[in-house]
Amino acid sequence: MAFEDAALERALRAETKHGLTLCGGVSELTVIGCGWMAVIPEIELRDRLRGTLGALVEMLGYIPGMETVQIVRSKGAFVVNTVLPEVVGEEIAGYIVEEDEEEIRPTGLRLGLNFLMQKRNGEIVGVVPRGANLDVRRYAITPGGIVRQEDGDTGERLYRRGYRPREDTDSEATLRKWRHLEAMSWCDWDAPEE
């Protein structure tokens, strides 16, 4: 799985507010942001002096190696803390272990920063796409709410479901509006995928 370079660079710059975790490996670098993960092959890191590598070097001041670090912005500067790989292992596993997926498609509707997507069963979820290309039509969602976007040109992108009303915290009016949205079919499931 890989991000298109410019999209990942934008995501890296945007996510420093929440913090990033970088896990260096022998032949790849895993980058975890707020609700997304990307795996960048080492060859891409070494070959591209701008884009992804440039964004990381700008934040860190060096090329990440065989280490696991968290980057957060503090008082206008980036602070880098070394962490144990085991600390982030569970989060990485959450992205790559889930295999049961359902097809999901964009509805063309938005709710704040969330793009609304609908499963075949009618359930609608709000997703915050981080640097995603919404023209792509092949999406799947795992039980844990990880949405996968597949595109032959840019590889696979992963990002977590952003918003769905909850019975215990949201108002009845919000839940009623959401149920109304789910009662309608926003996607042409019989249309061939592009």
Functional labels for PLM-detected ranges:
Residues 1-40:
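The feature marks the first
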Residues 26-27, 32-194:
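C-terminal functional regions that serve as terminal interaction/effector modules
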